[in-house]
Every structure is written in C-alpha cells, then in structure tokens.
C-alpha cells in the first residue's frame, strides 16, 4: 500500500484556481476524479490528517500512488471536465462513493407527445436522449434552472402534467414563464417539441443557429410592434450569451480541434493538448520532453514541428492498424498551436493527407479558441513546474545533485548551503540585488535578503560587475562581523544566520561577475567559500581564474539544482525591484513629515483633492481635517513651504524605505 507522503504535492505548488484532479494507483489507473473551486484547498485537505478522513476517502488516498490536476478558467469548466473524465475513466472510487448507483443524467423524452426534461438514473431507453453523466443531481437542476428561462420546456412528471391539464391551470413554472405550459394549450405539441429540440441543440453545442434564429424573431417582433415579445427574446439572447461566456472550454461552433500549448526552459519542455470534439473538451494529454540542444529543434517553432510530426504520425498508425476503414480521423479539422512551424504549408499538407480532408493549422487570435488556448498554456506551465519541483523535492535526487556538484567543482564536501545573488535594474536605475539561500537542496526563505545598491550606478550593463562586487562585500562583511559575535550570541541562545559561510556562492553571470566576487572574498580574507557563476544563455558554470567554463551534462541533477537556485534569485530580485520602483514613483512630499502616517496623508489628499490644493491651504483649514491636530497642521504647512523653496531631491523617495534597506539589507523575512 503506497504511503501518501511519497506523492503528496507541496501545498505551495498547487494552484489556487479551479480545476479537476485525478488520483491514480501505482499502475497508472485513474481511481478517482474530482473538481474543486480551489485546487490547493481541496487537495491539501486529503493529506492534512489522514486519520480524520472518511474511511472510503482514506482508502482512496492510501491506494493512490500519484495525483495530478488540470487548471481551468471557471468552475463551469471544471464541472464539465469532471463529467467527461468520469465517463471516460470510470474510476472505482467515484462509482463506489455513489453507493453503486449510476451517475445521474439529463434525460429528454423525445418519444413522448410532450417531451420533458428530468434527472434520470438507470438503464438507457429507446427514444430518450441523454446528456451527461453528471456527478450530482443538483448540477442538472442548476442547468435546467438556467436554461428553462430561454427554453421553457416541460419538466414535470406525467402525473402532474395530467392533473394540471384536467384543472386547466398551469403550475408555478408556467406562471413565471419557465415552462411554456403545454398542459393548458398555451403552445401546441409541435411548438413545444421545437422548444425541446432547440434545448437539445444548445447542449450539443449548436449555439450559433439558435442565436441567429432568436435575433431574427426579435427583429420581426419589433417590426410587428410586438415589443413585449421582442423584449423577451432580447432577454433570452442575453441569457444565452451569459451562459456561453461561463463556458469558455466549449467552442460554440461545435468544431473538432486539438489545442496545443508549450512551456519550456533551457533543458526541457512541457506540452499539453486538449482534444475538443463537437465543441466540447473530451480529453487532455500532457508530456515532458527533453530538448535536443539543436537551436532549430529547441525553440518554440521547432518544438511545435516535432510534436505535430510525432504525435499525429503515431495517431495515424494506431487508427489504421486497428481498422483501415475506420471513420475516426487521426487528425481533427483544426489544430491550434502557439506558433506556426517554419514550414507551415508543408506541415498542413502532411496533416491533410493523414486526415483525408482539409486541416486548418493556425494560431488562435481571439474569442473562445484563444481563451481555451490560454487555459491549455496554464496547464503546460503547471506541468513543467510540477516536474521540476518533483525532481528537486526528491531526497535521493537532491543528494545526487549535491554529490554531482561536489565532484564537478572539486569541492572538499557537498555544498549543503548554497547562496546565490542576482542584480535587477532598469537602465541603471533602482538597482537592487537579491540573496537566496538553499540548504540541502531546498530553499530556506527565512534567510533571503534584499539589497539596495548604493555605489554602482550608470549604464546598467557595466554596473552589473560593480553591483556583484558590492553585494558580495556587504554580505561577507556581515559574515565576518557575525562570526566575531557568534560565541556571545550562542551563550544567550540566539542564532546568527550569517555567522557561518555558505559552501557554495553562486552569482548570476559569467567570468567578469565571478572574478569580481572572488576578488572581494579574497580581500575580506574569506577562503572557505567556493564561488561560481552560472551564465544564462548556454548554462555554463564559470570558476574564478579558469579560462574555460565547466560544462555540466544537460540532464544532470546538479545543473537542475543550479538553475533552480538562479531562477529563484532572479524572481526575488525582480519582485523587490518592482516594489522599490513603485514606491519611488508614488512618493509624496508628505511622506517624511513627522506624525503624519498613511491614514492621515490619505485624509489630507482626499479632503483637498490634491497636494497642489493642500499647498494653498492655511493652518486653520488643515486643522479642520478630521484627525489632524494643530501641531501636525503646522508641520504640514512648514514642510510644504520648505518644499516650494527648495529644489526637488530624492529625499522623499529615500524616506519611505525601511531603515534596514537604507543600510543595505532588508531583514524582514520574505516569501
């Protein structure tokens, strides 16, 4: 029996968006399908306390060997995908959770004179059309409640229908116009059947014709001055449009298409495909592929070309091997990709030959197809992130990565503590740096630090080297200071996070950056820290004083770890840079006034409308603002007068920065 802790995803790695998740057993069989408004909340509930789960749920969690998910745009999409996958996979725990009952479906009795819509369980009957299955009966009732506003078809039982026919009075739904009331002859049997057929067409994805027909009837009613009917049709059209907007997973034109998306880094790529048949998502597949390293094959155009060739070639082999006369085409009518391959015309011709009829290969630009393409892309990004996190989170993998780093760099011991710095700026302005810490191959966010660069400024590119040198000097000067005080603090029970050096110090860059960092360490007398640089373009590892870089194998766990450390430093630096730039751009002359906090500043600006109007106000007028006393009003007035009489300076910007940032380090733990 698998241990749930062996496949439990990290909570932070699970998206908060709505989606559908699948538990698989160790053999890869789907044993449970579920949907969630928030994937993170739902999935973490399965692993929080195994003993507190329902016995059936606990059995499912302990039987499963893996869990995966698909992100969608809305809860409606998640519901729809859940239905399709329950029908496709027939998961054992889903069925048994329903107490061995069949899943409910939406039945339409086309074999009756007055067809009706209702929730149904049981064997299929001739002359009845079914939509579903659904996981819950309430989902069908919600669908009926929404659509009977537009398609007022009968939903009552035969007994209720006969009773109201006898008393010649409609039920409540008839009075509120959610039923066309065929029981009292408000519509004929043929008119009611047409309403039901339109309802079926809508659920089948044939929405364009319905919208056109309603619009034509609305215009005709308006021309006949039947404005009440025209208004009702207008409301029906709006209701249809709202229903379609909530279902961006569905193509309104009922087309067959494959929607393909990629997410890649320097070494690998994730590809996701949503298979749309009849306008609805019928399946989803995903792969992680290793890049070849050839620029022609590793860019997005090359990835698209390789995927189309291999995937549809294999599909054609499967279809024709099973039945040479099969009417199932290996290629759908449309293939939607993020970019066209280099030889788009040749690829289209090849796909057309496989299908036996014209295939449209294109990039979606707008509408529901563009929306679905964005959903598929989100899933590709999630798949790649999960793949990388799984590799990094595995203890064996992390141990192998540290051992590979030790061997490749000739270190005396495995680099159990790795620190990495990265510089972020825009053309030399708002230059900041980040320092991230990894211990045992995992991030230690409580030790992350921000730096505001004080000495380097200028054209940006050339200042990267000076900025690297400054951050290195300040970080290890702090290490020297902490090392001197470590005995004193240890006696008092305090920990000094920088009292010991990292085993490996990584800088983002090549030989110039690495040599600058090594020079600073040498000047400070730090000799027990290995320094390397990781260059982005070719992922080369540079060592100080060496003319050539160290080339790690592209599939090595050591390179994966270095990439992850470097990418985390880059993310952390960009986040701080954006925050600092935003504070500078929104700094105010009121920021540095003693006794004037954020709430009082907002009250002043709200009362006077702008700082310019505030400058014209007297002390008495400022005092009239709620929460502003006489002393504060005088301070505000004096500060505004002083600002007008002096040239603008950067003091306002510096005043809003925390004290530790002015000293070079923000000691607030960051996430």
Swiss-Prot record:
Domain (UVR): give its ranges.
208-243
The record places domain GIY-YIG at 16-95
Subcellular localization is given as: Cytoplasm
| Gene Ontology MF terms | DNA binding; excinuclease ABC activity
The alphabetized UniProt keywords are:
Cytoplasm, DNA damage, DNA excision, DNA repair, Excision nuclease, SOS response
What family does the Swiss-Prot or TrEMBL record give for this protein?
Belongs to the UvrC family.
| Entry function | The UvrABC repair system catalyzes the recognition and processing of DNA lesions. UvrC both incises the 5' and 3' sides of the lesion. The N-terminal half is responsible for the 3' incision and the C-terminal half is responsible for the 5' incision.
The identity of this protein, by name, is UvrABC system protein C
Q: Which organism is it from?
A: Mycobacteroides abscessus (strain ATCC 19977 / DSM 44196 / CCUG 20993 / CIP 104536 / JCM 13569 / NCTC 13031 / TMC 1543 / L948)
């Amino acid at each position: 029996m698998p241990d749930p802790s062996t496949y439990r995803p990290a909570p932070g790695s699970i998206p908060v968006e709505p989606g559908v998740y699948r538990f698989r057993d160790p053999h890869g069989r789907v044993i449970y399908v579920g949907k969630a408004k928030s994937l993170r909340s739902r999935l973490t509930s399965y692993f929080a306390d195994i003993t507190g789960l329902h016995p059936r749920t606990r059995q499912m969690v302990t039987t499963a060997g893996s869990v995966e998910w698909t992100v969608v745009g809305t809860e409606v999409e998640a519901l729809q995908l859940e239905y399709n996958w329950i029908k496709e996979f027939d998961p054992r725990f889903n069925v048994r959770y329903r107490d061995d009952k069949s899943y409910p479906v939406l039945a339409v009795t086309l074999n009756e004179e007055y067809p009706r819509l209702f929730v149904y369980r049981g064997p299929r009957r001739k002359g009845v059309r079914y939509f579903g299955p659904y996981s819950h009966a309430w989902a069908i009732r919600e669908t009926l409640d929404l659509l009977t506003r537009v398609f007022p078809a009968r939903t009552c039982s035969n007994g209720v229908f006969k009773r109201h026919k006898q008393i010649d009075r409609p039920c409540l739904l008839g009075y509120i116009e959610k039923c066309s009331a065929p029981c009292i002859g408000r519509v004929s049997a043929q008119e009611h059947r047409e309403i039901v057929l339109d309802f079926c067409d809508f659920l089948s994805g044939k929405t364009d014709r319905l919208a056109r027909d309603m619009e034509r009837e609305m215009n005709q009613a308006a021309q006949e001055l039947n404005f009440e009917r025209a208004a009702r049709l207008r409301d029906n059209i709006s209701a249809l449009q709202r229903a379609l907007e909530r279902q961006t997973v569905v193509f309104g034109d009922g087309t067959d298409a494959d929607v393909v998306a990629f997410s890649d880094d320097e070494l690998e790529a994730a590809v996701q495909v949503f298979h749309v048949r009849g306008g609805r998502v019928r399946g989803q597949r995903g792969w992680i592929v290793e890049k070849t390293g050839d620029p022609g094959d590793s860019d997005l155009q090359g990835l698209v070309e390789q995927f189309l060739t291999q995937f549809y070639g294999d599909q054609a082999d499967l279809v024709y091997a099973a039945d040479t006369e099969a009417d199932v085409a290996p290629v759908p009518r449309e293939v939607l990709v993020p970019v066209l391959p280099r030889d788009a015309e040749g690829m289209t011709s090849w796909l057309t030959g496989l299908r036996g009829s014209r295939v449209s290969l294109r990039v979606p630009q707008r509408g529901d197809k563009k929306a679905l393409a964005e959903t598929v892309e989100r899933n590709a990004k999630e798949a790649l992130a999960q793949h990388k996190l799984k590799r990094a989170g595995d203890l064996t993998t992390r141990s192998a990565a540290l051992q590979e780093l030790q061997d490749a760099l000739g270190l005396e011991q495995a680099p159990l503590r790795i620190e990495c710095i990265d510089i972020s700026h825009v053309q030399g302005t708002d230059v900041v740096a980040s320092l991230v810490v990894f211990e045992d191959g995992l991030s230690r966010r409580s030790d992350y630090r921000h730096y505001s660069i004080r000495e380097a400024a200028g054209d940006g590119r050339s200042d990267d080297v000076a900025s690297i040198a400054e951050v290195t000097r300040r970080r290890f000067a702090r290490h020297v200071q902490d090392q001197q005080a470590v005995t004193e603090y240890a006696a008092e029970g305090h920990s000094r996070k920088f009292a010991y050096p990292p085993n490996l110090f990584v800088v983002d860059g090549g030989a110039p950056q690495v040599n600058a960092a090594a020079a600073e360490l040498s000047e400070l007398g730090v000799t027990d820290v290995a320094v390397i640089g990781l260059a982005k373009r070719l992922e080369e590892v540079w060592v100080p004083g060496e003319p050539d870089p160290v080339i790690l194998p592209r599939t090595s766990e050591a390179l994966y770890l270095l990439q992850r450390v470097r990418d985390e430093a880059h993310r952390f630096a960009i986040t701080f840079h954006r925050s600092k730039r935003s504070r500078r751009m929104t700094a105010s002359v009121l920021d540095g006034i003693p006794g004037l906090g954020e709430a009082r500043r907002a009250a002043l600006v709200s009362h006077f409308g702008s700082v310019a109007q505030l400058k014209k106000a007297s002390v008495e007028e400022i005092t009239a603002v709620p929460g502003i006393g006489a002393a504060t009003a005088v301070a505000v007035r004096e500060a505004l007068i002083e600002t007008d009489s002096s040239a603008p300076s950067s003091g306002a910007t510096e005043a809003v920065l925390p004290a530790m940032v002015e000293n070079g380090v923000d000691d607030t733990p960051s996430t």
